[in-house]
């Protein structure tokens, strides 16, 4: 096993997610940018709590987790979200965690529904149930290169509840980063369109936040 590990390090050496330095997943300098705090924003009336500012280093960590499925990057995102869930004040309990789903194309490319997978692991650690009730109901574009207005248009009407989904009580939407709020806003709309607004509250937790929202 050690021989295989040594060989893999020769072919695919461990590099810092942030700066590419050899030898460790995240170096001391980049780790200084990845110390979770609590950042509060709003998407319309929905409260959003995030653990870190969305920096170039944070962007690289998210890409390493999302597009390459590197476990070390996953764990950095998971720890940031858990920090927020444990430290932020969400009011009435209990809550359930609702992950933002990936498109079918993204799931095929990555081999998983990224945030659903992370939220499942988070749920097991913090003991808050996961409610995987949302699905993408039509084709959407990659949000990364879109302006704010185009992101809103891209996500408008994109989410629906899964068949036989049951949504009761207070819910926390989970995502990796909030930049414009278009995705979280659409997720809240999908919940409220099913009459959920009358029976509970919707808030959100993300690992990172782009300040100010774009």
Annotate each PLM feature.
Residues 1-214:
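Glycine-rich phosphate/pyrophosphate-handling loop used in enzymes and phosphotransfer proteins
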């Amino acid at each position: 096993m050690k021989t295989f590990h040594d060989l893999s390090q020769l072919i695919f050496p461990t590099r810092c997610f942030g700066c590419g330095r050899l030898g460790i997943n995240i170096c001391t300098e980049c780790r200084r940018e990845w110390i979770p705090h609590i950042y509060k924003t709003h998407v319309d009336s929905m409260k959003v709590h995030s653990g870190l500012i969305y920096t170039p280093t944070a962007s690289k960590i998210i890409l390493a987790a999302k597009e390459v499925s590197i476990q070390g990057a996953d764990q950095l995102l998971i720890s940031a979200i858990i920090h927020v869930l444990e430290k932020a004040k969400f009011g009435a309990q209990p809550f359930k965690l609702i992950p933002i789903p990936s498109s079918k194309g993204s799931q095929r490319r990555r081999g998983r529904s990224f945030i659903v997978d992370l939220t499942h692991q988070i749920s097991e650690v913090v003991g808050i149930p996961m409610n995987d009730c949302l699905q993408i109901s039509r084709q959407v574009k990659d949000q990364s290169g879109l302006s704010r207005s185009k992101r809103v248009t891209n996500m408008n009407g994109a989410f629906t509840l899964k068949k036989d989904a049951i949504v009761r009580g207070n819910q926390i939407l989970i995502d990796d980063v909030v930049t414009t709020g278009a995705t979280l806003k659409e997720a809240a709309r999908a919940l409220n369109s099913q009459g959920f607004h009358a029976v509970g509250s919707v808030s959100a937790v993300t690992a990172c936040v782009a300040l100010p929202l774009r």
